[in-house]
Amino acid sequence: MPPSASSVGFSDLLNPQNPTESAPSTPVNKSPASSAPSSAQSNSTMASSVSLLPPLMKGTRPANEEPRQDLPRPYKCPLCDRAFHRLEHQTRHIRTHTGEKPHACQFPGCTKRFSRSDELTRHSRIHNNPNSRRNNKAQHLAAAAAAAANQDNVLVNNTGSMMPPPSKPITRSAPVSQVGSPDISPPHSFTNYAGHMRSNLGPYARNNERASSGMDINLLATAASQVERDEHFGFHNGPRGLPLFSSRLHNSSRLPSLSAYAISQNMTRSHSHDEEDVYSHRVKRSRPNSPNSTAPSSPTFSHDSLSPTPDHTPLATPAHSPRLRPLGTSELQLPSIRHLSLHHTPALAPMEPQPEGPNYYSPTQPHHGPSISDIMSKPDGTQRKLPVPQVPKVAVQDMLNPTGFVSVSSSTSNSVAGGDLAERF
């Protein structure tokens, strides 16, 4: 049985020397009638070989490249088992392990990088093609980036003319108030310009952020002190039979409250907004953890409606605190430390709230004893001493009895309230 045409074509393609060897085997002395079928057979063999050529080229290497398999592969990858004939092939392969992309696109506005040069060449065709949509988008992005860079340069060059110097020095200790004063630029113009400032104008922006954080802390402290005052007020308005010194001991044993922090923050802020600090400069705070303290942690004067405590809160002044006059007087001068007495001042008697009448003193009452101005006007330095207050002798039963002893009536005398209470306002 003769072999088929497809098998003959496949063997001839794999072994090119077979046709020369099989040529003598074909009969030469054939009749012309048999030559026509042989020519048709040869044509079909050529067609089948051509049809089989593409899959052979895809699946196997050409015959002229077979000797390349025997070439040495001296360049081996240190990270895997692959070896290469050329050094550049090994270098290109190692970049697949390291992720290095040394080939960057040189087109303005494009930030892409590639590990192989042929990938960069293929990518550059996108920018060179004028009909590509990606090219148009890249051009728009590049133009926008160039315009932004030019605008930044203009802003940096014109910062001296656009930003006026601040009219008041900015301190780190005083928080910035939200109330606008007439000598400060409007806040909206500063915030609009602050978004475009660069690193050389950074301290102003940081001061703004620090001020906002300080204001947040002040708001929290104010809210906490308000709650604390409400609780303190509810405690004092509770049962009338409770003696006041028990609450005084309870208040003096705790740590400094948040209300003292809020008042201290109000005292340290700038005086350009005095409408907020109408009463803060009049408030007298005594230290709650003082060993000689016999007063509550935060006694305040109830002289007007802006006082943080109600009008019927009892007024108590520790015995060791100085007798202060109002800040508006010009003759206020405190004695030096060497002129003060080192003797221990006896504690004041406890006082109870008066149920009726908001006023605890009468400005028209006669003044007993020398005042601070009289003491300070003495020429002799040894005579400049505060008089020792005369504490009334009260029994323990009178102190515990709410109706037996009321010390509010004597709070304006020299022994309890210092005698100069009317001069404080």
UniProtKB/Swiss-Prot annotation:
Principal localisation: nucleus
One GO cellular component term noted in the UniProt record for this chain: nucleus
Zn finger (C2H2-type) start-end: 75-97, 103-127
Superkingdom: Eukaryota
SMART domains, alphabetized: ZnF_C2H2
Keyword terms: DNA-binding, Metal-binding, Nucleus, Repeat, Repressor, Transcription, Transcription regulation, Ubl conjugation, Zinc, Zinc-finger
Start and end residues of each stretch annotated as Disordered: 1-76, 116-135, 266-327, 347-386, 405-425
Post-translational modification: Ubiquitinated. Deubiquitinated by creB, probably to control its activity or amount.
Bias-annotated ranges (Basic and acidic residues): 63-73, 271-280
Biological processes, Gene Ontology terms: carbon catabolite repression of transcription from RNA polymerase II promoter by glucose
Subcellular location: Nucleus
InterPro entries: creA/MIG_C2H2-ZnF (IPR051007), Znf_C2H2_sf (IPR036236), Znf_C2H2_type (IPR013087)
Keyword DNA-binding carried by entry: yes
Cysteine pairs bridged by disulfides in the record: none
Biased composition (Low complexity): 31-51, 288-302, 406-416
GO molecular function term, any single one: RNA polymerase II cis-regulatory region sequence-specific DNA binding
Biased composition (Polar residues): 1-29
Pfam families linked to this entry: zf-C2H2
Family statement: Belongs to the creA/MIG C2H2-type zinc-finger protein family.
Subunit structure: Interacts with creB.
Described purpose of this protein according to its UniProt entry: Transcription regulator component of the regulatory network controlling carbon source utilization through ubiquitination and deubiquitination involving creA, creB, creC, creD and acrB. Represses the transcription of the alcR, alcA and aldA genes by binding to a GC-rich region in their promoter. Also plays a role in response to carbon starvation and the control of extracellular proteases activity.
Protein name per UniProt: Probable DNA-binding protein creA
Organism annotation: Aspergillus clavatus (strain ATCC 1007 / CBS 513.65 / DSM 816 / NCTC 3887 / NRRL 1 / QM 1276 / 107)
UniProt gene name: creA
